[in-house]
Amino acid sequence: MVSASLDGGLRICVRASAPEVHDKAVAWASFLKAPLNPENPEQYFFHFFVEPEGVYVRDQEKRLLEIDFDKNHLDYERKGHRGKNELIAKALGVAKGARRILDLSVGMGIDSVFLTQLGFSVIGVERSPVLYALLKEAFARTKKDSLKSYELHFADSLQFLKQNKGLLEVDAIYFDPMYPHKKKSALPKQEMVVFRDLVGHDDDASLVLQEALTWPVKRVVVKRPMQAEELLPGVRHSYEGKVVRYDTYVVG
């Protein structure tokens, strides 16, 4: 997976034309270690656009990745949800009083944002610099009151766990590691294509889970595809849906 830097060779540039966003574009170009408005942008696979209306990413195939919690284009609201009866809420221990969650892999924020709607307070960690930039802007622009207190960190999840153990008060840890996408003939929507190209999959997922299980929390929940093996042995209970399941490890 892309680490918390772009030194691994991710080909990305930052593009901006409006004068009012110049300073923001300079800041993000510095953060991403990417050139701003290069003479030959076609040489870069990913383009990070900074515009007055917001930021977004396009790849060379013109596929779009945008994070906007108010547009709900990625079904952030999940209308018709069952509230605390949702599998993810049950897995995290809402019935046991769990309220403060550490999300180790925010990604596009779909599960994190949903958890805030269910009444959880969420601390999120994202190690892809591009996704972090998109998320940071989305949280800054959102009008949703439930997201105003969201705490987002740019960090490698494994290092974050090691450095912050005992320093954060959380009831449960949530982890949704990326897994290899094998069915190339059935590509998902364009956002997921760009997302997977950006972040790949989590080679260190089992190490992250091992470290998470050392934290003083009530439980650790791992989201898995229905047919996938347990990330580590010791699952106390699995909350199974049609496509995914939530493996729960009881810690304390």
Curated annotation (Swiss-Prot):
GO terms for molecular function: rRNA (guanine-N2-)-methyltransferase activity. It catalyses: guanosine(1516) in 16S rRNA + S-adenosyl-L-methionine = N(2)-methylguanosine(1516) in 16S rRNA + S-adenosyl-L-homocysteine + H(+). Keywords: Cytoplasm, Methyltransferase, rRNA processing, S-adenosyl-L-methionine, Transferase. GO terms for cellular component: cytoplasm. InterPro entries: 16SrRNA_methylTrfase_J, SAM-dependent_MTases_sf. The keyword Endoplasmic reticulum does not apply. It is an enzyme of class 2 (transferase). It is found in: Cytoplasm. S-adenosyl-L-methionine binds at residues 126-127, 176. It holds the Pfam family SAM_MT. Its EC number is 2.1.1.242. Specifically methylates the guanosine in position 1516 of 16S rRNA. Belongs to the methyltransferase superfamily. RsmJ family. This is Ribosomal RNA small subunit methyltransferase J. It comes from Bdellovibrio bacteriovorus (strain ATCC 15356 / DSM 50701 / NCIMB 9529 / HD100).
